[in-house]
Amino acid sequence: MTDSDRLQQIAHLRREYTRGGLRRKDLPEDPLNLFEQWLDQAVAAGLPDPTAMSVATVDEHGQPYQRIVLLKHFDRRGMVFYTNLGSRKAQQLEKNPRISLLFPWHMLERQVMVLGSVERLSTLEVLKYFHSRPRDSQLGAWVSKQSSRISARGVLESKFLELKQKFMQGEIPLPSFWGGYRINIESMEFWQGGAHRLHDRFFYQREGDAWKIDRLAP
């Protein structure tokens, strides 16, 4: 297949956005209120993994990295996710706490972008969440040295069985290398698909205890 053939196969893939627009008069003053409304609608619509978000970080050379992570909590203090503290993203966040999140709710013709910086969660917060997870997920956190190179999947499976036997009785302890982050939100952008590619975009920028709202050109 030539490059021209491949281009022809994907260049026509598009659709019209017809689900409705977003108007300034309908926006709440706090973006988290709108985010909660949209997330509830994504759940009600049966979207797969509605809390899945693309998490973008950068390394010391300015190279961006992205991965899908699940949002686990949000409130006025920010948005929370958990991870292995030895992972690539955690190591990058330790050196540069700047972060970007993106929630892609394609079926609803919506997306939400979040910009901010992270802070580590307290051990108490992490412990409470860790013990709310399914037992096998707790074991999985112990097994994987995230982002490290391994020779085969069997290495993980053998370690899982070993730890399952080790922790058969009683509570599984919190690994010292497992934790979480809270994103201190500085701005949020809400995108709603529109007819003729005239999409609606609204940008919330934190100003002290309030939010400045601007409409952006699509």
UniProtKB/Swiss-Prot annotation:
Pathway terms, separated by semicolons: Cofactor metabolism; pyridoxal 5'-phosphate salvage; pyridoxal 5'-phosphate from pyridoxamine 5'-phosphate: step 1/1; Cofactor metabolism; pyridoxal 5'-phosphate salvage; pyridoxal 5'-phosphate from pyridoxine 5'-phosphate: step 1/1
Pfam families: PNP_phzG_C (PF10590), PNPOx_N (PF01243)
Binding residues annotated for FMN, in chain numbering: 67-72, 82-83, 88-89, 111, 146-147, 191, 201
A single MF term (Gene Ontology): FMN binding
Cofactor: FMN
Residues annotated to bind substrate: R14, R15, E16, Y17, K72, Y129, R133, S137, R197, L198, H199
SUPFAM superfamilies: FMN-binding split barrel (SSF50475)
Cross-referenced Gene3D superfamilies: Electron Transport, Fmn-binding Protein, Chain A (2.30.110.10)
Subunit text: Homodimer.
UniProt similarity note: Belongs to the pyridoxamine 5'-phosphate oxidase family.
Described function: Catalyzes the oxidation of either pyridoxine 5'-phosphate (PNP) or pyridoxamine 5'-phosphate (PMP) into pyridoxal 5'-phosphate (PLP).
Stated name of the protein: Pyridoxine/pyridoxamine 5'-phosphate oxidase
Source species of the chain: Erwinia tasmaniensis (strain DSM 17950 / CFBP 7177 / CIP 109463 / NCPPB 4357 / Et1/99)
